[in-house]
Regions:
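Structural signature of outer-membrane beta-barrel domains
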Residues: 40-42, 77-81, 124-126, 143-149, ...
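Residues that define the transmembrane beta-barrel architecture of outer-membrane proteins
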Residues: 29, 52-56, 111-117, 134, ...
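Predominantly the C-terminal beta-signal and adjacent terminal strand-loop region
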Residues: 180, 186-250
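Short loop/turn motifs that connect adjacent beta-strands in outer-membrane beta-barrel proteins
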Residues: 20-30, 66-67, 126-135, 187-195, ...
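N-terminal signal peptide c-region/cleavage motif recognized by signal peptidases
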Residues: 14-17
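Extracellular/periplasm-exposed beta-strand and loop segments of Gram-negative cell-envelope proteins
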Residues: 44-49, 81-113, 147-175, 206-214, ...
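Short glycine/proline- and aromatic-enriched beta-strand/turn motifs that initiate or cap beta-hairpins
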Residues: 20-69, 234, 238, 250
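Residues on the lipid-exposed face of transmembrane beta-strands in outer-membrane beta-barrel proteins
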Residues: 35, 58-62, 74-76, 117-123, ...
Length: 250
């Protein structure tokens, strides 16, 4: 029994040493999933409508043996600061309240919601970090940015904010976007601590997708420049290829 335990320990030790040597001394082909969080400040026209926002991020990316980096990223945007002038002004009473169908004062939650999805490409420059697979990560991308105002009135029923009427207030906006990221990409030698962190900028060339704003009784046809500047950080879930058709997640 003791011999078996000794052999098992030696096997695990040799496996760990080999794995660390493989990451430390060679540049790996590395497909991986990323999961992270971002926090951004708006700029341009977006700053006139929303405040700072957070984002939950998920992506699938590949780092080649030559450290080229490419993939697809999806970010879900959310925030609680909305400063759209005159929003719901046509529904307010003289006291500045909104009433539901029963004539009761309705509690409203007005929030930002949106997403951006994009393809990205760039390179890992191994000038810092513990191995050839870590370093300065620089990427650029192109995709779609979308945002709108979320109007939540919970259990209260407000006919003017139901169905097609709601579209007259939500300011749904989207369009082409471009993205830039610079940060640090880290794959540890023991494969246990893998992460990214850095700064990102987004520029969206957007416009309203609603035909009519009911509160202002106007049509919004303006071209917009929506910008986001912020920080991102997240975890890297690696998919290493060990043998033909076999993949392992770390």
């Amino acid at each position: 029994m003791k011999k078996f335990q000794l052999l098992f320990f030696l096997f695990l030790f040799s496996y760990s040493v080999f794995a660390q040597w493989q990451v430390r001394d060679s540049s790996l082909f590395n497909p991986h999933v990323t999961v992270g969080y971002g926090y951004s400040t708006p700029g341009g026209d977006l700053a006139n409508r929303f405040g700072n926002n957070g984002s939950i991020e998920v992506g699938f990316n590949v780092k080649s043996k030559k450290n080229w980096y490419y993939g697809v990223q999806f970010n879900y945007l959310f925030g609680n600061r909305v400063h759209e002038p005159n929003l719901l002004s046509n529904l307010l009473t003289d006291r500045g309240e909104i009433l539901d169908e029963d004539g009761q004062i309705a509690t409203m939650f007005i929030q930002e919601r949106g997403f951006n999805v994009f393809l990205q490409g760039g390179k890992v420059l191994p000038i810092i970090g513990p191995n050839k697979n870590s370093g300065l990560l620089i990427t650029a991308g192109v995709g779609l940015l979308q945002h709108k105002i979320r109007l939540e009135h919970q259990e209260a029923k407000i006919t003017q904010l139901e169905g097609e009427y709601l579209k007259g207030y939500d300011r749904l906006t989207n369009g082409l976007s471009v993205h830039q990221f610079i940060g640090y990409y880290h794959l540890s030698n023991n494969r246990l601590i893998n992460f990214y962190i850095g700064a990102q900028a987004t520029e969206g060339f957007t416009q309203s997708r609603r035909e009519w704003n009911l509160d202002t009784q106007t049509q919004d046809t303006d071209k917009r420049l929506d910008m986001l500047f912020g920080l991102r950080a997240g975890w890297i879930l690696n998919l290493y290829q060990r043998a033909p058709n076999d993949f392992y997640i770390y």
